[in-house]
Amino acid sequence: MPQTQTKEFLSNHPLFRTDDLDEARHCVTQKFCDHKLFLSSKGDQLSVHHNHVAGKYVSVNYLHYGANVQINPGMLERFYLLQIPLSGHALVRHRGKDIVANRKTATLLNPDRETDMIWHKNIIFL
């Protein structure tokens, strides 16, 4: 069965596009929290798309790195993070447990727990 292309949600609300790792980390930090960001695979090329709509108490984000990346935000501190995979998969370590996030399994991250994630290049989160 062929894999379907995932629509880019919130495409009318682009926040940024970049191929630069440091710029991606800086821009994502502005909307979420400080974090470490590394390419997981040599030779991978970033192609970050981040769309964002802000409400009074909640924001909705579409985020795709286009490469295998490791993200380590530590503790989120001031917000919960619901990650809903639209395609692909990621490994999320939270509360001492490993969770494979995919189209059947979303993750809800607590602000007071350490988090470490590996997003595979095909993962797209809403």
How should these model regions be labeled?
Residues 1-56:
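A short, N-terminal "cap"/entry segment at the start of jelly-roll beta-barrel domains
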Residues 45-126:
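N-terminal regulatory/effector-sensing and dimerization cores
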